[in-house]
Amino acid sequence: MSRIRIVALVLLAACYGRDNPPRPHTAPTPAPTPIAAAPIDTADTKAKLIAKHGDAHRARIEQGVDQVAKLWRPEDGDRTAFGAFCDEQFLADPNARDALFERMQTMLEQINGHNLEVGRATRWHTEVDTGPMQPIDALLAGYDPSAHVVDDLFASKVAFAALLNFPLTTLEARLRDGTSWDRRAWAEARLTGWFDTRVPSNLAQAATAAEVAADQYIAGYNIWMHHVLGEDGKRRFPSGKRLISHWNLRDELKANYADDEGLHKQRTIARIMERIVTQTIPRGVIDNPHLDWDPFANKVTAGQEVEADAPKRTTTLDDAREPDTRFQHVRAHFLAAREIDKFSPIAPTRIARAFDAAEMPEQRVRALLVELLESPLAADAAKEMTQRLGRKPEPHDIWYEFGVPTVESELDAITRVRYPTADAFAKDIPRILKDLGFTPERAQYLSDRILVDPSRGAGHAMGAERRGDKAHLRTRVEAGGMDYKGYNIAVHELGHNIEQTFSLNEIDHTLLSGVPNTAFTEALAFLFQARDRALLGLPSQSAEVERLRVLDAYWNTREIAGSALVELDVWSWLYANPNATAAELREATVRIAREVWNKYYEPTLGGHDTVLLGIYSHTITSPLYLFNYVLGHLIAFQVEEHVAGKDTATFATEFERVCRLGAILPDLWMQQATGKPVTAEPMLRATEAALRSGR
């Protein structure tokens, strides 16, 4: 499906609010994109239209007719019907064409927005913690009201009217010519982007079903840590601590650098992660506090202490491993994508569609990943880390935090008192926004358009897509209140919601709502997340804290770069081995994760053949998304550098301004936001300076 539909759930803000009238449409029309040979003879139709409207419209007529013909099917009508449609719907008058554009834009906002609301309702009980789920909830969540939209718009010929009158563009053309387009030209490109492929609704529904099943699988992938034993058999985690993979496991590991028993805990968590990736984890211990588990010996014993609120689970002692369920979900995504590939001539693989949605070529993204991974700064950063740790680095130190260590329990105490419920966080949003620099009026305007829901999963942001609807912030609140991990995620998701709200309600063309790609949504959310401790009233950062923040940004970005590279290589392997079983996919994933680790991480962290790079749950729920996080960190760093040293009011003003640049090319967006294209150089330069000043 189109780029617009791919990124629909994460569309954020765009430029020109209601106080800023749109500029005249003065930029050159996007250059015609070569179209494959039409399945029917178009010569007669073109000749008649040129004779009717004049040679001045020849280029538009030829391109529009070819665009329609390429996706016209026998059920749409015969040659006569095709010609009649083109004769009736081609618009030579600029005013009529403008009216069509506005009709289409308004229609798509309403269709997209209402379908999102229906989908949000059908998935409500699987995504929001409303109590025990009912059997029907999973079935309702599998319903996708938008699955038939594009199919129906083709069947009704609405899609063909857009393709006949507005240019369809390829990524290559947008990269080549897009810098000269004005916003109307970009909006036209986004309009036809809805219809660049014609995927049958049953295939779209199958892809959605795979996504829902994977989401539910991961949402239930919790480890009850009080029932996980260390290598010495000791129970080190408190009763009731339930961690979802991978987010909470990773964050718990990061939080234990200041703990007296932290190293033992970290080694235990790392072993859990390895068991998950290799699928040697006993299936009986997943989300089960009735069994104790030693992940080192991989032995299951009867639970000695069971929490009062423990869910009903098996008490049967069984060491049988999880039967490659993790990779069955990846394979299901792949099989659904393969069917869609046949109907995606512009981007004929899931990989190609991911980069088409990002509007950055795969080769360029891979080059950025490798640039980070091969930088010699890693050795210097690891050397400082080793000195701070006072021990030899271990593989789990890939998640080391250079920042000033804080015992997580101290932060938990603050957040649990302040946010006993999701509603308490919602009521505090105006204060949070004012502390970030937004005016009281702006803070209230934004908070009035955001609802907070208790999440079953780790948390996420769901923006509205129709003016009049509201964005939803999903955050996980355990019994006893929101812990720091949940708060940290909630602040991140709030950043998404603020972007989404600006986008939807203040935009010249709703077709340009959002940002160039999902990496930018993550980048702007990271700007909020980086200020989470300040929002709790903790001391402002010193020069040393700022230096360590830079090292953190580099170390974290480099960590995700490896995981992203593993995922890209896994999907390339899948396309080269389309008949692979889940077991074969597991073996390939483990092999690739080890190869990337051994090449880029073993020199600084040791751990030959470590598989930790395969732990990210995104690879199960949202395939080919991880590279966006790397881009997001780079973009966030560039934007943060742009607002560095400015007061909070300036931060808020600049945050809104860059959010409102719209869904244009990534480099064009970044150039207008910071004066530089997307690059790793600012981060690497700052990292080098931070390392030098710390010596």
Q: What would you call each of these model-derived segments?
A:
Residues F502-R558, G632:
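Post-HExxH zinc-binding segment in Zn-dependent metallohydrolases
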Residues L473-L504, A525-F526:
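Active-site recognition of the HExxH zinc-binding catalytic motif
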Residues P32-E305, H333-T406, P578-R695:
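C-terminal, non-catalytic "cap/extension" segments appended to globular domains
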Residues L12-A14:
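C-terminal motif of bacterial Sec signal peptides marking the signal peptidase cleavage site
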Residues I286-L291, E441-S447, E506-F520, L538-V545, ...:
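Short, glycine/acidic-rich hinge or "gate" loops at secondary-structure transitions
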Residues P405-D469:
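Auxiliary, metal-adjacent structural segments of Zn-dependent hydrolase domains
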Residues Y16-R18:
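Bacterial signal peptide processing site
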Residues S2-L9:
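Sec-dependent signal peptide recognition
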